[in-house]
């Protein structure tokens, strides 16, 4: 990882949080805050871990966190491989956004082009306000939305992302979603006709991708249209 913020999730079971903090070269953010943070959707903001403050317990499978290293390097997790389906409890609170992640040391299918049946969006459609996954894109300094109109998207091991919960529902990530891939998590695997509109103010960039899909409407098609991430 570089020294930018990354969204991650433990790909193993049993990684102690205090041990992780002691071993990893986490950045100093401000005051006693360090480069490890949780997202709290009750107040729509980040909550930071503090230097020297012990946190009991392990990382929970499927929970996402923000991590920033002091220097570029690898992020390591130690534990046992998850060999069962993972159920992640979500809350709606202020805005419904939940930071979750891939709980396996293998890629998982994000949308139906990655796997027609066993993918996160299809399996969890009834539990999400918007059938979209949001990933932090360091190149554009913005969140990249992935939906059913996106190209085949396989979520990398330890990758964190946001979803928007309908209520106190569960997000289900199953063993059947796993696959072996040799590409990174942001590589588009297919090509097709599309229009991309780009807006920039000199520091931030926003893209709007327009696809031609048979059967789509000129209105809002949940699962095929996505809004800009509004969690922060």
Give residue spans per PLM region:
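Compositionally biased Ser/Thr/Gly- and acidic/asparagine-rich
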Residues: 2-15, 19-22, 30-232
